[in-house]
Structure formats: structure tokens, C-alpha cells
């Protein structure tokens, strides 16, 4: 069994926590999780890939043991990927990402031309800037963001969290290994013995705001502008995947990605939901290795 090595890069106020499976010297694979999760939820996928690749996965900013600076635009996350790539001097990278983490990799690949060998992106968060809309978020999405702020953040113990999440529809199909990894690494101990979400409701709400804006085609970015137009200039092979049981918005954003990215290929995971890597890790490993041939 290949146990991951945990380390971090950067100063304490801007650190990025990283897991590594397997010894150095093999072609690198870089994994980026979706919103709310942590690097460790890739464990079942990463262990299998480590026989072929040196596998790295990061806690994205606002999550796990990484920094929580308050800035959560898409380009902030892409810049973090670039920091990891440059610090570790990674080349010919196989980027593997889920949801907003997949977006990080797509945008970073444009910022670092020639560094990524290929990208395998599962239901990335994408807007099509050619069809952007004016105006802000819908009342429905604003209500979802507000609802995130009311999410329970503190629990008596990891076992309490596991049992509560195991019964929740969002985690019902996760493997036990993936869910336990999330509970172990997605929460931090408090002085009174209880535990608290690392990605607190306040942080998650801030992260979700630009994501919902991208979903609704109203994202405009910050002073750096809207980065999504750059996807038309990617210079490496990209496979965009969807999951048959996922929600309509994820399939719509995948269609946007396909329309923007040159030479893209597609894949469908049957009988799986949005978190396919945590539901059916063996199917993800098979598909990732097939695209890597």
C-alpha cells in the first residue's frame, strides 16, 4: 500500500498543502479537488495511479490545511496551481481535476504553456464568455449562497460527522474510504475537543459566489478580467467528462467547455454522480489511464 507524504509550499500566510503518492522520478500527475473537499478525497484514485505516475494533490485555497486568504476568483486558484508547478518544477504534467478544481487546471495550463501533457477534467465549472449575460445572480442562487452560511460547521467528533454525512444524499454513494478521508482531513480540532470544518461556511459561501456567477453566465471577474476566453487557446489534449446521474448544470458547463476548447474529446461515466472519483474510483482510474496512453 502506498501511503501519501504530506508537505506544504510557500510561507505560512500563503501556504499550499500537498499530498504526494509514490516516489519522485515518474511522470507527474496533479490532482485538484472540487469545492468544499480536500486533497485526501483522491486517495483511492491516487494510490492506483502511483504505480505509473508521481501523484500530487493539493488542498485548494480555503480548504484543508492550505491558506485561507479571502480571495477566491478563478484566476486566484489558477495562480496557486502555477505556484505548485513552478515550485516543484513539474513538466509534462497529467492534470486531473474535478468541478472547480478542473477549472483551476484548465486556466493554469493556459498560463503555463507547454507544461501540461494532457488534462482530464470531470465536469469543470465553465462559463462561455461569448454568451455572457448582464446583471447579477438570480435570487435562487443568492439564496443558495445564503443557505451555505447556515451550514453546520462544528461537531462533537469525527464519528458523529461520518454518521451524519453517510446519511446525507450528497455523500450516500461515496466509498467509505473517501468519506473517512474527507472527515479526517476536512475538519480541524478545537480546544474543547470538538471539530470544525476547515472550509467554514463563510469561506465556502465566498468560494461559491463566482462559481454560481459562472454557472449563470454573469461572471465578470476582477481587475484581471474574465479568464474563460483563454480556453480557446489551450495547447494540450483535453478530455472533458460528465456523469450520467449528475445535475443538468454540470452537463451544460461541460458542453460549454467542449465548445471552447480546441480538439477536446469527451467521456461519460455511467451510473455515477457529480463526485464520480469518490463514488467509483476504479472507473476513474481506468478512464484516466486510458486517456494517458
What are these regions (language model features)?
Residues 177, 187-259, 265-268:
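Conserved serine/cysteine hydrolase catalytic core
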Residues 32-34, 98, 242:
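The conserved beta1-alpha1 loop
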Residues 1-31, 51-53, 90-91, 126, ...:
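Alpha/beta-hydrolase fold catalytic core
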Residues 269-281:
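Catalytic histidine-centered segment of alpha/beta-hydrolase-like enzymes
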Residues 48, 91-137:
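Conserved hydrolase catalytic core segment
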Residues 129-199, 218-219:
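Helix-rich cap/lid subdomain of alpha/beta-hydrolase
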Residues 76-93:
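Conserved acidic catalytic loop of the alpha/beta-hydrolase fold
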Residues 17-67:
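Conserved HGGG/HGGXW glycine-rich cap/lid loop of the alpha/beta-hydrolase fold
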Amino acid at each position: 500500500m502506498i501511503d501519501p507524504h504530506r508537505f506544504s509550499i510557500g510561507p505560512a500566510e500563503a501556504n499550499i498543502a500537498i499530498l504526494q503518492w509514490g516516489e519522485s522520478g515518474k511522470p507527474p500527475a496533479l490532482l485538484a479537488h472540487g469545492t468544499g473537499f480536500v486533497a485526501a478525497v483522491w486517495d483511492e484514485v491516487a494510490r492506483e495511479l502511483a504505480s505509473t505516475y508521481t501523484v500530487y494533490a493539493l488542498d485548494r485555497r480555503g480548504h484543508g490545511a492550505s491558506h485561507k486568504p479571502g480571495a477566491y476568483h478563478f484566476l486566484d486558484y489558477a495562480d496557486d496551481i502555477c505556484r505548485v508547478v513552478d515550485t516543484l518544477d513539474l513538466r509534462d504534467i497529467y492534470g486531473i481535476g474535478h468541478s472547480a478544481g478542473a477549472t483551476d487546471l484548465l486556466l493554469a495550463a493556459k498560463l503555463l504553456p507547454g507544461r501540461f501533457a494532457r488534462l482530464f477534467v470531470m465536469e469543470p465549472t465553465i462559463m462561455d464568455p461569448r454568451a455572457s449575460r448582464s446583471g447579477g445572480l438570480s435570487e435562487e442562487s443568492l439564496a443558495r449562497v445564503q443557505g451555505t452560511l447556515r451550514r453546520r460547521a462544528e461537531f462533537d467528533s469525527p464519528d458523529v460527522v461520518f454518521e451524519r454525512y453517510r446519511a446525507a444524499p450528497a455523500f450516500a454513494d461515496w466509498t467509505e474510504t473517501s468519506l473517512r478521508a474527507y472527515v479526517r482531513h476536512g475538519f480541524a480540532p478545537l480546544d474543547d475537543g470538538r471539530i470544525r470544518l476547515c472550509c467554514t461556511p463563510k469561506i465556502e459561501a465566498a468560494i461559491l459566489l463566482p462559481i454560481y456567477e459562472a454557472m449563470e453566465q454573469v461572471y465578470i471577474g476582477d481587475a484581471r478580467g474574465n479568464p474563460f476566453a483563454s480556453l480557446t487557446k489551450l495547447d494540450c489534449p483535453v478530455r472533458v467528462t460528465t456523469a450520467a446521474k449528475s445535475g443538468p448544470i454540470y452537463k451544460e458547463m461541460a458542453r460549454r467547455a467542449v465548445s471552447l476548447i480546441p480538439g477536446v474529446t469527451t467521456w461519460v461515466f455511467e451510473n455515477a454522480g457529480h463526485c464520480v472519483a469518490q463514488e467509483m474510483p476504479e472507473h476513474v482510474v481506468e478512464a484516466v489511464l486510458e486517456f494517458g496512453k
